Amino acid sequence: WGVVGALIFTGFLLWRREAQRKPLATAALTGALFWAATAGTITLIEQQARGMPDVALHSLNGEAVHMDQLAPGQPLVVNLWATWCPPCIREMPVLEEAQHIYQDVAFVFANQREQPETIRSFLEENRLNLNNLYRDDQAQLARAVGSNGLPTTLFYNAQGQLIDSHMGELSRATLARGLEKIRGPDQ
């Protein structure tokens, strides 16, 4: 409300005092730009420092597992995907390979709203062997992290803080950059 009040007051002064219109307009514009930049930076920092959401995923057998139980004390890559999503399908071999190469990082595959039979058939047809495969039955994880599309890949550090995210198909280079951020440059 303070910003709205300041804008109304500035508008009143601009209307009443013709000689001060240009300096007041310049000051108001500068202040508004500074406020917008600061608010944007704070929002970005808050988003990047978010912890793991309090969401339960389900194994293909129906067992519930909370996000914070997936890889305590270990960097974590979470991939939100679906069998009907072409970019998800194209990136799966990259992620499957990475889960074997980067043993110090846990890779979790959170299928969005599909039945276990559909997921099993997809894995068999595509000859994929994915560890840590779960279902996000109600897309709670997607909502909690603000994902607006698939695939979405989340990169958490060993302390459970969201360090980076990527929406869209993941290339080897993009995956490597995300892994460097959560593992450290020397690993």
Locate the predicted segments by residue.
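Hydrophobic beta-strand anchors of alpha/beta hydrolase catalytic cores
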Residues: 77-78, 107, 153
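Thiol/disulfide oxidoreductase modules built on the thioredoxin-like
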Residues: 124-129, 136-186
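Conserved segment of the thioredoxin-like fold in thiol-based oxidoreductases
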Residues: 100-138, 150
